[in-house]
């Protein structure tokens, strides 16, 4: 009986450990940190800079209260967003009409992502880091995470 209880306890611990190391279903997929052409500061130029968040899981996920942050401390907080399984939400830096879950707008009047080096951090509603994506490049304008 003691051997069975020990085996069950070990199985529970191993299952919990595997679950805690499983990759998150919500991930940063890509960052376009340098909009094409000159950085004019126009809304069109700002909106050509974006980050995509992908639901890699098998069910829809609510992102209410989740946050994206750059290294400088610019923060976007997701409102009431349901991201279907397998779908991507593109968060544009500038202003525009939100079409959740596909296109969201930060409504910033300045560029969020540094053209040379930056890091995006995705946090859930509890403030836990879910994913990070960093880049250090002058030869490309997009980072696949």
Predicted regions and their residues:
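Short Gly/aromatic-enriched secondary-structure transition segments
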Residues: 64-70
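A structural motif detector for short, solvent-exposed N-terminal "entry" segments of globular domains
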Residues: 2-9, 16, 20-64, 109-115, ...
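Hydrophobic beta-strand signal
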Residues: 52, 69, 90-92
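Short amphipathic beta-strand/extended segments with alternating polar/hydrophobic composition
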Residues: 76-81, 128-139
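Intrinsically disordered, low-complexity Pro/Gly/Ser/Thr-rich segments with frequent PxxP/GP/PP motifs
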Residues: 73-108
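Acidic glycine-/aspartate-rich tracts in secreted/extracellular proteins
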Residues: 56-59, 94-98, 125-129
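Extracytosolic low-complexity repeat regions of secreted or lipid-anchored proteins
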Residues: 100-134
């Amino acid at each position: 009986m003691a051997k069975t209880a020990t085996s069950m306890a070990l199985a529970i611990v191993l299952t919990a450990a595997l679950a805690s190391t499983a990759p998150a279903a919500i991930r940063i997929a890509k960052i376009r940190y340098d909009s094409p052409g000159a950085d004019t500061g126009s809304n069109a130029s700002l909106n050509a800079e974006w980050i995509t968040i992908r639901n890699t899981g098998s069910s829809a996920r609510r992102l209410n209260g989740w946050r994206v942050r750059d290294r400088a401390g610019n923060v976007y907080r997701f409102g009431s967003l349901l991201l279907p399984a397998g779908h991507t939400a593109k968060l544009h830096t500038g202003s525009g009409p939100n079409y959740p879950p596909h296109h969201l707008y930060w409504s910033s009047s300045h560029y969020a992502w540094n053209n040379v080096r930056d890091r995006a951090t995705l946090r859930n509603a509890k403030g836990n880091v879910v994913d990070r994506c960093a880049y250090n490049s002058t030869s490309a304008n997009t980072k696949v995470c």
